[in-house]
Regions:
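Domain-level signature for soluble enzymes in the chorismate/prephenate branch of the shikimate pathway
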Residues: 1-218
Length: 218
């Protein structure tokens, strides 16, 4: 399971686009199988976690697999009514399985964010749209460095939507931070905020400027 942070740190990939997808999990079974036949359920660890209430309430034994589609394929090939997969509706069509229960996820409002990434840097022109600027930075080693570095965003009224820390390789006291903000890098408020941040940084790298997914407006 390769995380976005791995791709960014190892290959210095840039972000071109974001897309949010509503997560909908279904219980897929061999055609004709009933809920009382099911003993084992297979899926990706995240899908199993997102459907934990359903799994527990039915007394199923959860088995972790590499991905949801692969779980559906395995259940189809084994052709055992005691086995089920948690996967998408598309997987049911692909592997000739029946959807026994739809939308079994614990949180019906769960979303997953997908990013389109690549080597070259490309960004939309600054206009009358909602943008996200994503960047990576490493702070100078000093007390209260993170607190001081973020002050410029508050002063200039720039909203941070994401801030995640990652330890530098073979270090317990040096961290990189992955950050998203609302705004285009050519916006003066954003520029002033990043200039202030830069005073506290050893390393700074813009990962991408892209239009915000429309779901952020809801």
């Amino acid at each position: 399971n390769i995380g976005i942070e791995y791709l960014i740190f190892k290959y210095r990939l840039n972000i071109y686009l974001e897309y949010f997808q509503k997560i909908e999990h279904n219980l897929l079974v061999i055609p004709g199988a009933k809920i009382t036949d099911i003993k084992n359920v297979y899926s990706h660890s995240q899908a199993l976690s997102q459907c934990s209430n359903f799994i527990k309430s039915n007394g199923f034994v959860a088995h972790v697999r590499a991905d949801t589609a692969g779980s559906a394929e395995m259940v189809s090939k084994n052709n055992d009514i005691r086995n089920a997969a948690i996967a998408s509706a598309l997987s049911s069509e692909t592997y000739n399985l029946e959807i026994l229960k739809k939308n079994i996820e614990d949180d019906r409002g769960n979303l997953t964010r997908f990013l389109i990434m690549g080597k070259k840097i490309s960004q939309p022109e600054f206009g009358n749209k909602k943008y996200i600027t994503s960047f990576l930075f490493k702070l100078k080693s000093k007390p209260a460095a993170l607190y001081q570095s973020l002050g410029g965003f508050a002063i200039n009224g720039v909203n941070l939507t994401k801030l995640q820390s990652y330890p530098e390789k073979n270090s317990f006291d040096s961290y990189f931070f992955l950050c998203d903000l609302d705004g285009h890098i050519e916006d003066k408020k954003v520029q002033k905020s990043l200039e202030e941040l830069g005073l506290h940084c050893e390393d700074f790298h813009v990962l991408g400027v892209f239009e915000a997914d429309k779901i952020r407006e809801k």
